[in-house]
């Protein structure tokens, strides 16, 4: 058949029966197109292509709206055909709206009618689809490759059928695309219900009048997000009326359209439909099952659309109905048939414009929500099923959760309503009184999971924990004033004896301390006082493991005795031990509670021991002669054995007089008494006390081993020394009697860079000194090592008398046991040996005959304590006054002391670098300075009435540490003025040549703990011992692995993603939707022809307010596992390594072993280090938990409500209008937290600029681990993210709250969904800068009654606590 000479005619389909237009037009059109392909016979492919393009364009253009008009979504729009849409550059539409008026009485101005002119942009869009025809198929369809066989004819039919299927698929894509495009258009202009509904309440005359109202609005928004999100999931079971109320609010919070259209949708009874509710199939089904009543199952819908007319240049006026084709019967007759003989029919069509538009009845679900009749539509299956396009109403919601781990409640909250509710094992202490170390919660499947301190190893057991170099650089740029240098400056002692040095120090103390030091004031503060906005020193509390302080700049420590007048700067020193954390942030109650936990099932001192030792430490009449004996023995085992008889008589006499034990202030004496006098020489009860005391010291030593994981030495030190400072040889005991600790200290190696100054010069040891060699006025660096028991040869090398364990036990005794008994009422004293030895030689001993037996009673004239022998200023007087019964044989032994004498009390200043567990390129230059007395004594309770002490005859105060610096003992140094004595009551009078508080290993918080503690001695010894555990990464790895509370808590942050099912409501005729002429572009390709179909579209809103709104109605499923996967910085963070390679390797191995985020295989040379892939996944994508170090005393109630994980509110939404206000809200801690005005923060280690948490998670510092990909904390710590979200929130309120004011025709108002409003239903945590509390508890028993209102549902039981769910998920998981 030859068609070259015939005019091309588009085939006319069969007439469609009336009343079945929408259901049959597709079938008819498809048949027409198929018949056309079947009838084509031509060798001219060009003619075929032209004919096909025209047919295809007309075909698709005609049928695009067929399926769309069957959808309830068509209620919301006015569809208008606009063939010239492709030529529109800048389309705008003008509306005129008359504002309503209210006539009022009284003295009110008379209102005039107000007209508002509003102009809106036309937003241009397009739809595109494509398909291809292979060259072989073209040949078959065109007949060029037909060979006349039946096979070729069959192939041609199959080619035509395949082409028809392709075209049908393209048409189907346009039909689906129209619905998808309009749905997205409606979503673009629909603000969330949680925003739109509150604005109707808090809008004053159309706008938010003040920042107070805006603050109230923000508070309401927060509440509505929690309550309204997932309202269907929460209330569909028990409180269906709340679901109906939320739906009614959704359909009533929008503004009606300005369009008065002739096209109306109605039910079968003729009642107009007010709008459409679009949701998912699941939500639709749940709403129809007992929540909403189905009013009708069919609807009458119009089947016409308008036509655009061009009037003017670039200004398009939309005729809401326009000149319209009457119905789709006319479309089938006239648009698919364009013959000239049908023009007459078109003219008739125009004349019939005034006729009532035709409608078609389609199946629909019509429900009544309140008083509004709406379509209930679900497009999920009808439009989106089997496509690769996600359903827009299935969204993602990211929620960030916060879980407090290890918080210690204040005493008023550590109660139990019924102590018997959770009963421990009979006979055992209640573990619920211990500080919590684990928190339990449920994952997405309702399984109970936990996080403990060990989970945080990947965060703090990392070298970034020690990276403070950038912090120092930053804070040194700020101005600082040096109010008081005492405690922040160290010097060497001046020339002269220690007594002269002490006097010179007290004479010039006021120059170093013109004001009260910060470190003493902080030790007496409460947590509220420390964190108050008025605390100017809060800005230096930046890190849990470092002290930042103002000190003299450009002075090498130790500096000159008189501090030079230099500029101040900020210095940093490692706190070394958790006991040095300031008391307000690690309070005494917590330390004692931890000590009680450690004392359970371990050695405890007998009550008799406690009474006897406590009595000795508090005895104001303790015999002064005992201190004299200590001095002449001066730790010498040889001398002790020589004077054993005298010592026995002293101990026995004091025991009989007071039932207390002597010499408990001297560790060497206790050791010798246990070794030599414990076999019946003393009363059994007395011996048991010394033995019990030593066993307690050894038990404290074993405590360190129990909380240390065994391993190979690192940096030349064992792990117990890296874990507890008392086992570190770098720290000397406060009192030494020989050179043993110094010799053991020298074995540490050069890496510790230890230095030692003895009396200000280098150290040198001498074996011993006899009477002929003694020089009491000696100065310099010589220290007497004491005479050994055997091997007496001064030419032999000087070796220790005892093993290193002796020094360890000595430090444990002095730093843990002595403070527990003395409670700060003791002081290290210097000894005036130039007076002590002459006094010892003044003893009066009566002569006895060779056959006479020494008398035992002082009433005997031959007894040395008989009144006739009590000569003034003799040793006899001291024994007599102390009621110590000694005999002649015992006193004769005193002549042995001259064979091994002490010359002086010598000040020793020792310094050391950090150990291998804390040494990095930043910390290696930080040195500790600790003072020690060689040949000094520890004086217990001060004896106010002893004249020899008051005059400083034999002893004078020489405090080496705040633990041994009782101010009353300064009375033994005559001549001190009242100002010094008064200052010593507030500030420990430790000379700066014995170190300074910030440079000492043991600092003021430990001393104040001993003073303020109300715990018994057993608990306090363990509590003090726990305070000496170190704060380095390696030490923390041991403590976490063994269940030791490190003295700080954590804020756990986790972000989870949930799939949501949203509900969209749109007013009827609220959107004008324009469709241009479809264009077909043909592109020749290798092997065939590609066809690309493009149809321009446009839309414009027809409202003077928001005509659509949506809400997250139901929770579909959690995407993440809501689990307990801890962050591992070794996988995400690069930072300075540990200086010791073994230490760095040890940390990596310990942290990564068993860690689910451990690196996969060896570290690659190129590329990124990736985590190991698990063999299986059961609960979904693992959500990462990050840890923010938090003070253990943080307010637990802060975590019971939505809060900022930093510990302080952030975001411009809280700020005023100043440019710097938003930054000040986030970082200016001189102002209170907007949410908690009485305090600046709840966590100074994270909320302040350059704090540890800020440096760890703030993306501003360009750390590769601080990113939104790896870190859920990123959005809370990064200022740009906070400001961006805050600006979104501010602009959101301003945009949505703006009223339509009288305006000119040039005003353009687009009621679009404000930028950032989607965060209300997608990421509210970043918008509000708050994370939500998750149902969690430190005790699984509390989780068994978690629901509010349930009988017995307690939030706490002693030290344990329960945090209730205050998130939008509350009520969504009834099984949890």
UniProtKB/Swiss-Prot annotation:
Keyword Glycoprotein belongs to the record: no
Molecular function GO terms recorded: structural molecule activity
CC annotations in GO: host cell nucleus; T=16 icosahedral viral capsid
Domain of life: Viruses
Subcellular localization: Virion; Host nucleus
Known partners and oligomeric status: Homomultimer. Makes the hexons and eleven out of twelve pentons. Interacts with triplex proteins 1/TRX1 and 2/TRX2; adjacent capsomers are linked together in groups of three by triplexes, heterotrimeric complexes composed of one molecule of TRX1 and two molecules of TRX2. Interacts with scaffold protein; this interaction allows efficient MCP transport to the host nucleus. Interacts with capsid vertex component 2/CVC2. Interacts with the small capsomere-interacting protein/SCP.
Family recorded in the similarity comment: Belongs to the herpesviridae major capsid protein family.
Xref: HAMAP family: HSV_MCP (MF_04016)
The protein's role, per its UniProt record: Self-assembles to form an icosahedral capsid with a T=16 symmetry, about 200 nm in diameter, and consisting of 150 hexons and 12 pentons (total of 162 capsomers). Hexons form the edges and faces of the capsid and are each composed of six MCP molecules. In contrast, one penton is found at each of the 12 vertices. Eleven of the pentons are MCP pentamers, while the last vertex is occupied by the portal complex.
Protein name: Major capsid protein
Organism of provenance: Equine herpesvirus 1 (strain Ab4p)
Origin organism lineage: Viruses, Duplodnaviria, Heunggongvirae, Peploviricota, Herviviricetes
Gene coding for it: MCP
């Amino acid at each position: 058949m030859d068609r070259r000479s015939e005019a091309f005619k588009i085939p006319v389909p069969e007439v469609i029966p009336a009343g079945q237009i929408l259901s049959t037009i597709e079938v008819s059109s498809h048949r027409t197109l198929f018949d056309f392909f079947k009838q084509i016979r031509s060798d001219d492919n060009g003619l075929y292509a032209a004919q096909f393009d025209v047919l295809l364009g007309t075909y698709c253009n005609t049928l695009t709206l067929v399926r769309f008009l069957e959808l309830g979504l068509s209620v919301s729009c006015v569809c208008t055909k606009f063939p010239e849409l492709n030529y529109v550059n800048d389309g705008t539409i003008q509306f005129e709206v008359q504002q309503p008026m209210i006539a009022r009485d009284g003295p009110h101005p008379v209102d005039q009618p107000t007209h508002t002119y509003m102009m809106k942009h036309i937003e241009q869009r397009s739809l595109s689809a494509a398909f291809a025809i292979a060259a072989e198929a073209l040949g078959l369809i065109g007949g060029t490759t037909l060979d006349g066989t039946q096979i070729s004819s069959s192939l041609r039919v199959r080619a035509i059928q395949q082409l028809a299927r392709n075209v049908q698929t393209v048409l189907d894509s346009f039909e689906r695309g129209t619905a998808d495009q309009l749905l997205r258009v409606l979503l673009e202009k629909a603000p969330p219900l949680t925003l739109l509904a509150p604005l109707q309440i808090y809008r004053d005359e159309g706008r938010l009048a003040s920042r107070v109202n805006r603050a109230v609005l923000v508070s309401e928004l927060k509440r509505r997000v929690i309550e309204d999100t997932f309202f269907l999931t929460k209330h569909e079971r028990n409180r269906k009326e709340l679901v109906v109320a939320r739906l009614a609010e959704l359909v009533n919070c929008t503004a009606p359209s300005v369009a008065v259209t002739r096209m109306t949708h109605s039910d079968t009874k003729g009642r107009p439909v007010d709008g459409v509710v679009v949701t998912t199939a699941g939500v639709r089904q749940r709403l129809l099952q007992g929540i909403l009543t189905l009013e009708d199952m069919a609807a009458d819908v119009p089947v016409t659309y308008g036509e655009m007319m061009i009037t003017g240049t670039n200004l398009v006026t939309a005729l809401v109905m326009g000149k319209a084709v009457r119905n789709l019967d006319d479309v089938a007759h006239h648009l698919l048939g364009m013959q000239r003989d049908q023009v007459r029919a078109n003219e008739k069509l125009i004349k019939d414009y005034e006729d009532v538009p035709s409608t078609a009845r389609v199946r629909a679900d019509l429900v009544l929500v309140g008083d509004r009749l709406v379509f209930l539509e679900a497009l999920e299956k009808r439009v989106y099923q089997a496509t690769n396009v996600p359903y827009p109403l299935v969204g993602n919601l990211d929620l960030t959760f916060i879980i407090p781990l290890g918080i210690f409640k204040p005493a008023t909250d550590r109660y139990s309503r019924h102590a018997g509710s959770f009963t421990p094992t009979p006979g055992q202490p209640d573990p619920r009184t211990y500080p919590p170390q684990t928190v339990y919660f449920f994952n997405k499947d309702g399984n109970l999971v936990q996080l403990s301190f060990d989970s945080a190893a990947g965060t703090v057991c990392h070298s970034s924990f020690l990276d403070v170099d950038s912090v120092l650089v930053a804070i040194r740029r700020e101005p600082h004033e040096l109010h008081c240098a005492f405690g922040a400056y160290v010097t060497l002692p001046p020339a002269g004896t220690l007594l002269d040095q002490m006097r010179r120090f007290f004479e010039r103390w006021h120059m170093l301390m013109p004001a009260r030091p910060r470190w003493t004031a902080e030790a007496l503060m409460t947590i509220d006082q420390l964190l108050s906005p008025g605390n100017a020193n809060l800005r230096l509390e930046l890190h849990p493991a470092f002290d930042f302080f103002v000190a003299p700049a450009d002075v090498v420590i130790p500096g000159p005795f008189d501090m030079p007048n230099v500029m101040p700067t900020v210095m940093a020193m490692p706190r070394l031990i958790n006991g040095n954390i300031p008391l307000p942030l690690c309070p005494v109650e917590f330390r004692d509670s931890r000590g009680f936990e450690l004392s359970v099932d371990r050695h405890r001192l007998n009550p008799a021991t406690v009474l006897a030792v406590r009595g000795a430490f508090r005895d104001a009449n303790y015999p002064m002669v005992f201190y004299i004996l200590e001095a002449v023995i001066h730790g010498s085992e040889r001398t002790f054995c020589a004077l054993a008889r005298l010592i026995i008589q002293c101990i026995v006499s004091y025991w009989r007089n007071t039932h207390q034990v002597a010499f408990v202030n001297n560790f060497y004496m206790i050791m010798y008494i246990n070794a030599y006098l414990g076999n019946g020489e003393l009363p059994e009860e007395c011996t048991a006390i010394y033995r019990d005391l030593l066993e307690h010291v050894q038990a404290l030593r074993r405590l360190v081993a129990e909380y240390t994981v065994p391993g190979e030495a690192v940096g030349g030190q064992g792990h117990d020394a890296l874990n507890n400072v008392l086992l570190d040889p770098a720290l000397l005991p406060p009192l030494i009697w020989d050179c043993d600790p110094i010799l053991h200290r020298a074995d540490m190696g050069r890496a510790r860079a230890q230095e030692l100054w003895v009396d200000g010069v280098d150290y040198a040891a001498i074996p011993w000194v006899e009477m002929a060699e003694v020089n009491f006025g000696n100065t310099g660096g010589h220290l007497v090592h004491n005479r050994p028991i055997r091997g007496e040869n001064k030419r032999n090398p000087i070796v220790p008398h005892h093993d290193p364990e002796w020094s360890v036990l000595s430090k444990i005794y002095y730093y843990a046991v002595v403070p527990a008994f003395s409670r700060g009422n003791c002081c290290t004293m210097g000894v005036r040996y130039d007076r002590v030895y002459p006094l010892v030689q003044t003893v009066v001993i009566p002569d006895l005959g060779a056959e006479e037996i020494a008398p035992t009673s002082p009433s005997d004239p031959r007894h040395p304590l008989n009144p006739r022998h009590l000569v003034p200023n003799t040793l006899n007087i001291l024994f007599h006054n102390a009621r110590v019964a000694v005999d002649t044989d015992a006193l004769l032994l005193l002549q042995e002391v001259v064979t091994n004498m002490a010359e002086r009390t010598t000040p020793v200043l020792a310094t050391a670098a950090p150990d291998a567990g804390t040494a990095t390129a930043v910390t290696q230059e930080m040195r500790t300075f600790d003072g020690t007395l060689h040949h000094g004594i520890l004086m217990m309770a001060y004896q106010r009435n002893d004249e020899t002490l008051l005059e400083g005859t034999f002893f004078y105060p020489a405090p080496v540490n705040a633990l041994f610096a009782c101010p009353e003992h300064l009375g033994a140094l005559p001549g001190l003025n009242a100002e010094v004595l008064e200052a010593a009551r507030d500030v420990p009078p430790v000379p700066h040549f014995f170190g300074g508080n910030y440079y000492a290993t043991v600092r003021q918080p430990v001393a104040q703990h001993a003073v303020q503690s109300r715990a018994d001695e057993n608990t306090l010894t363990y509590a003090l011992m726990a305070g000496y555990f170190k704060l380095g990464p390696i030490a923390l790895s041991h403590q976490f692995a063994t269940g030791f509370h490190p003295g700080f808590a954590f804020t756990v942050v986790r972000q989870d993603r949930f799939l949501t099912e949203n509900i969209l409501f749109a007013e009827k005729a609220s959107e004008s939707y324009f469709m241009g002429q479809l264009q077909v572009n043909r592109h020749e390709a290798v092997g065939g022809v590609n066809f690309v179909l493009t149809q321009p579209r446009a839309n414009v809103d027809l409202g003077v307010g928001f005509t659509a709104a949506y809400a997250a109605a139901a929770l579909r499923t959690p995407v993440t596992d809501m689990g307990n996967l801890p962050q591992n910085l070794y996988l995400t963070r690069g930072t300075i390594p540990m200086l010791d390679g073994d230490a760095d390797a040890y940390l990596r191995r310990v942290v990564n072993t068993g860690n689910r985020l451990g690196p996969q295989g060896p570290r690659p040379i190129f590329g990124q280090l990736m985590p190991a892939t698990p063999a299986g996944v059961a609960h979904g994508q693992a959500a990462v938990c990050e840890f923010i170090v938090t003070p253990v005393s943080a307010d637990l109630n802060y975590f019971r409500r939505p809060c900022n994980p930093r510990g302080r509110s952030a975001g411009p939404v809280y700020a005023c209008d100043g440019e710097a206000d938003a930054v000040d809200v986030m970082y200016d801690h001189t102002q209170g937290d907007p949410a908690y005005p009485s305090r600046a923060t709840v966590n100074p280690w994270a909320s302040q600029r350059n704090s540890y948490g800020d440096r760890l998670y703030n993306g501003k510092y360009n750390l590769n681990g601080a990113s939104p990909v790896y870190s859920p904390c990123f959005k809370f710590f990064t200022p740009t993210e906070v400001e961006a979200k805050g600006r979104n929130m501010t602009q959101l309120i301003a945009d949505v709250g703006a009223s339509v004011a009288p305006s000119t025709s040039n005003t353009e108002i687009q009621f679009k969904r404000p930028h950032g409003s989607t965060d209300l239903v997608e990421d509210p945590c970043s918008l509000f800068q708050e994370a939500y509390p998750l149902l969690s508890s430190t005790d699984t028993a509390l989780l068994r009654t978690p629901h509010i209102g349930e009988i017995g549902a307690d939030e706490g039981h002693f030290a344990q606590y329960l945090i209730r769910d205050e998130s939008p998920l509350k009520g969504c998981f009834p099984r949890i």
